Each structure stands twice: as structure tokens, then as C-alpha cells.
């Protein structure tokens, strides 16, 4: 069994973020990290692989040079190998372009043996569109089971459990399939020192768009089918108003709401 888990290197959510002139998030000059929910995706892939016995887990990422750090983190957690799609022409890809490149990479990985399961996180913290998993499945022509909190594989099928607002839902699909994992799925393992050192010896393949047979004008800013029309930083949070209750706190609160047109 072969499992591909897609991971993304994103700006640290605790760090200050700036927008470029094109309205996109500036990614240079700041600390980055593995997308948080992708840790849950890697954990889910590893659990499936361990239960299957002898399964191979391949981490897949795309992006600039430092994007490989996300793949290396997956290797430290237990993935067997990694692929980094590195090509300047892919910069600025929208969700559909990203899915197009990742699908081409999955197909190339499958040249060495069928890929049974593709696992992703439910969303990336730098965009939160949640579009890539479904778009990737569509590109590959396979079923997508989204927002999974539990993933198991048996008898040539994947079974996932989803937590909905008022009920749990269990879905089953024949392999190959794609599963996007919820941030409530599991608690990702923390690699120990031995795992971190062992990851240094694991192979990381670097592929260009040419290696994947993807024309540059189909992806990146040039091939994007969506455009950012406007973007601006979120306004700074205003200072809190403290009300001392001397018997008229309710009246003070009501006056504040009326003054700020909140009531």
C-alpha cells in the first residue's frame, strides 16, 4: 500500500503578516512552519500505514526552497520519503493551480507503483479556502472524503468518520481515494531526537514543472483562474472599555452600545 500525504509550509500564525502589492501574503523574510492541520494529516497517514503493515508514506509539498521544511517535518514524524515540487513558475498558484501541480506529482509518484490513498489537511492557515483537497481529487478522478476525524483502511476501502453539527457520519469509499483530515482528528506525534536524526537520511526528490509535464502557463500567477480584487489587514483591536459597577453598570453598557451603533 502506498499513501501520499500533501503538506504545506506556511507563515507562522503567531508572527506578523504583511500583504504584497498583489494582495497576496508575503512569504519571504518570515519564519515558517508545517501547516498545523497537516500534522494531523501526517498522523492519520502514519496510523493507516502502521495498521496496514509495510505500507509506504510519501510526503508531497510544493513551494519555494524553504517549503522542503514541511516535508522534512513529515519525515521526522515517520514518513518514508518526500517529494518537493520546486519551480518559480508555480509561484502565485491559486487553489486550482496548486491542485493541478499536486495531481501531476501524484501521477508521477504512481509510476513507481499505484497510489492507494491521498491524505491532506482540511485547509491551510495562510488561505483557509479548503478548496485544494476536492480539486485535487477531481484532477485525479478519485473520490474525496472530507473533514475526517477518524480514518481506517480495510478490504480495499477507506472508512472515515465525520463529526457534524448534530450527528456523526461514517462514509466508505473504494480505493484509490482522497481523505482530508480535520484538526480534531488526532493528536500528532512529536518526533524524538532519534527520529529527527533518522529523517536526515531519508530521500527527498526535487521535481520541476518540466519533470511533471506541466506547462508553466497553466499554473502560477500566469495560469491562475482566480484573482484577488482587494485585500487589507484586519483592523487592530480597540482597547477594552472597563465598566465599574456602582449600580448603573447596565445603563453604562446600554449607552456604550447605542453610542457605537451596536444596538
Model-derived features: positions:
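N-terminal glycine-rich FAD/FM-binding segment characteristic of electron-transfer flavoproteins
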Residues: 1-263
